[in-house]
Amino acid sequence: MVPKSFASKCWLIARAAAALGLAFGLLALTNPPRALAANDRFRATIPDGGAGESDLLRTPLQFEQAASGHPQSATQSLFSRCRRPPFSGTVSLYSPITAPVFDAIVNDTAFGFADGSSCYNPQNEQNIVINPANAQNVVTSSNEYRDNVHAVYYSRDGGQTWNNVFLPGWTRSSGGAGTFSHLDSCGDPVLAFSPDGQRLYYSGLVCNFDKFPRTLSGVAVAVSTNGGASWSAPTMVDYRASGDFFNDKEWVTAGPGNTVYLTWTKFYQGPRGLGYLRSPIVMASSSDGGKTWSSVKAVSDAAHPFNQGSQVAVAPDGALYVAYEGSDPATGYATDQLVVARSTNGGTSFLNSQVARVWDDLDCYPLQLPGAQGRQTLTNEQFRINSFPSMSIDPTTGGIAIVWADDQGAGNCGSGSATFSGVSSNQVKLVRSADGVHWTAPRTITAGAADKVYASVGAHAGRVVIGYYTRAYSPAPTATDRSCGIAELDSTTGNVVLPTDAGRANAAVCLDWAVRSSSDNFATEKRVTTQSSNPYITFAGSFIGDYTGTAVGADGKAVTVWTDFRGNPGLTPANQDALVGTGF
């Protein structure tokens, strides 16, 4: 049963959305009865609404056209500036990207508008892996908005040059057969190498929103035996056509031999697909390299019915770990916890333990402005955020590192209020364990008032590296340079104007990417990006992906990947691209 506070919040948001007539598509979750019913106090327990997840609008072009045709008032509509001066045309605000940072996207494509302007297709939400048998073979992935496909990007020179591969057979547009012939890409791409480096697994979501409200969704896996250059057709791991549940946020890992594990969140939406009853973390496994899969098993326990954002990994001793964000039964599900599920019998059973408080309450963040999803965001930003964990297990020592970002200590966070008051100051937290049973106390590894979000972690050869976005380097906008400021659409004139609120008009909103490592006990922040870039560039600033990636190779060197908003200066105008930093 959904707690009363959840239901009350659902009703209020649904009523407000109906009054505004919001139908923004792709990243606005245009299933108001379904998605908004899940938009309760615990914002981790919301279907992600990522790539392609929409009834009506599946592409950035459709999103832009809907926004321009149905603008909100100037103080509410945050408009994508990939087609607005000074972000339009071929002139870039940014200098070329240089080593040790490289653009993983090759031959990006653009889509045009009736007025002659255009935008380049975005890529966001990345995962990255290093071949354990060949540190030069680096592979990453992202939500790919070129032609409704699943895609990976592989390198054979340590991340300096890249090849882009569209995976065959996942969707109707990529030659899908059988069930896949009427499905679309729903994002959440994840990669995992087998311990010997011989097999590379890719997992992702597929769905069909044409059947709303009984939305169809599935999770599938494909395999590469040549480091990502070519791929098998996908195998469906879990799919039902009832629409009574929605699969979301899957994660894949590989164990010794041909063992593969896949976890995800299963949102139970009721017999008509319009509610939100619970969201357990579940798992399926394969013992033949992903050809066949077991039945679905529970990972989270009955005490934790509302969960999201799982990551699964195998320790050197064969123990299986699943980290996720779950609501805390001790507080009536009013607060959140980092939960770690441990299995020593190959996933037959799990022991779930609450490891750390996660400060992700209803009163810990402002909400997105109307026109987006009503999700948590940062002060003066518009992209949705979360506190899902990122986990890595060192294959040489068995040490486990888990990171996340939350807003502890900011404003009235944790006061029990229904709304946030103050200024966000998100920070990255770290917990570690040598045995999977005993855990360190949460440690805040970042400092300063500027927000840090979407942390990811990699561990190998005794070294831990953590990457994250930071607002610490963003210049403030000026009268002559708005590149790191907010622009809004005047619904009367159609012009882009400054916010009327002085605080928003002067807000510095650009992001950078930074890393810290255990080499100096995480004391030093290394700025990876050479220029700050503006996240409002695509999707009206409402979506930059729900996770990032960091990995450490056997040589102790790290690669890290994030959504950057510069595009590829000199080749494309500003847009969302997957950039990879190497050699850290």
Predicted feature residues:
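C-terminal PAP-associated
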Residues: 38-584
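Bacterial N-terminal signal peptides
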Residues: 15-28
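Polar helix-capping/helix-linker motif
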Residues: 8, 30-31, 134
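Signal peptide processing junction and immediate N-terminal pro/mature segment
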Residues: 28-42
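N-terminal secretory signal peptides that target proteins for export/translocation
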Residues: 1-12
